[in-house]
Amino acid sequence: MNLEVTILSNLCYHEKYARKVLPFLMKEYFTTREYKIVFLEIHEYISQYDALPSLNALSIECQERTDLTEDQFKTIKEVLSELSNEKSEYNWLVDTTEKWCQERAIYLSLMESVTVSYTHLRAH
């Protein structure tokens, strides 16, 4: 199980963790479109219902999206099937998530800077 799946799993199964880290997570931090969509659905569910979503609820919400192809929905179902209620030590999980958020934010900022620099150089 990779870290992104661990984060998504714990957002679904561990309320204390979800309440602690959700305000700091951004969809841009996730590396695939499918992970981003699952994260967005989890975030939206928690925001709307003030409760953790079940995997069934997430599956239904994803199925109702109109911006997914059949293959993308199939991949999202595979991601959902990877989510588990495996216990992780809370402090380790929060620290690891915080570090991951910082690393992803730095990486995305660097990539944006490179893109801006490259665009600027090409314009001149």
Specify the residue positions occupied by each region the protein language model found:
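Noncatalytic partner-interaction/assembly domains of nucleic-acid and motor enzyme complexes
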Residues: M1-W100
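Generic hydrophobic alpha-helical segments
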Residues: I42, S113-V114
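Hydrophobic side-chain positions on well-ordered alpha-helices
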Residues: Y45, V116-S117
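A short N-terminal interaction module
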Residues: A105-M111, Y118
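Conserved small/polar residues in nucleotide/adenosyl-binding loops
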Residues: T119-H124
